[in-house]
From Swiss-Prot:
Protein name: Basic phospholipase A2 homolog bothropstoxin-II
Its biological purpose: Snake venom phospholipase A2 (PLA2) that shows low enzymatic activity even tough it conserves the catalytic residues. Shows a strong myotoxic activity and induces indirect hemolysis, anticoagulant properties, and cytotoxic activities. In vivo, it induces muscle necrosis, accompanied by polymorphonuclear cell infiltration, and edema in the mouse paw. It exerts its function even in the absence of extracellular calcium, indicating it is not a calcium-dependent enzyme. A model of myotoxic mechanism has been proposed: an apo Lys49-PLA2 is activated by the entrance of a hydrophobic molecule (e.g.
This protein's UniProt keywords: Blood coagulation cascade inhibiting toxin, Disulfide bond, Hemostasis impairing toxin, Myotoxin, Pharmaceutical, Secreted, Signal, Toxin
Positions bearing the site annotation: Putative cationic membrane-docking site (MDoS): R79
Gene3D superfamilies assigned: Phospholipase A2 domain
Family classification: Belongs to the phospholipase A2 family. Group II subfamily. D49 sub-subfamily.
Annotated organism of origin: Bothrops jararacussu (Jararacussu)
GO biological process: arachidonate secretion; lipid catabolic process; negative regulation of T cell proliferation; phospholipid metabolic process
Amino acid sequence: MRTLWIMAVLLVGVEGDLWQFGQMILKETGKLPFPYYTTYGCYCGWGGQGQPKDATDRCCFVHDCCYGKLTNCKPKTDRYSYSRENGVIICGEGTPCEKQICECDKAAAVCFRENLRTYKKRYMAYPDVLCKKPAEKC
């Protein structure tokens, strides 16, 4: 399933929200979303299960929950506007969905930056089979 998410990120191009999220991650962390965040831990990438492995994986868990709370929105494809002012992401005008999606992505990108010190390479390309514990609730 994660492979599909990686392919989606690569195929979406500049017209999709996943591309924008990737750009936010790059600007906030200095790391490319692929490979650093697309298959990290139990929640970074498509879907998620089990317990988050660390603070970075928890950022992805919270991001999944944020997307899950959106109604009638398409967070992986809806394009939104945002800018950066003095290093701060500012979500722009748009529909309520676009604004909420932007805020979810912004929170995750900032969370990744705030947890760079505890990022562990051993959780990159983490096997799903090791994520079988009961999932937390959002």
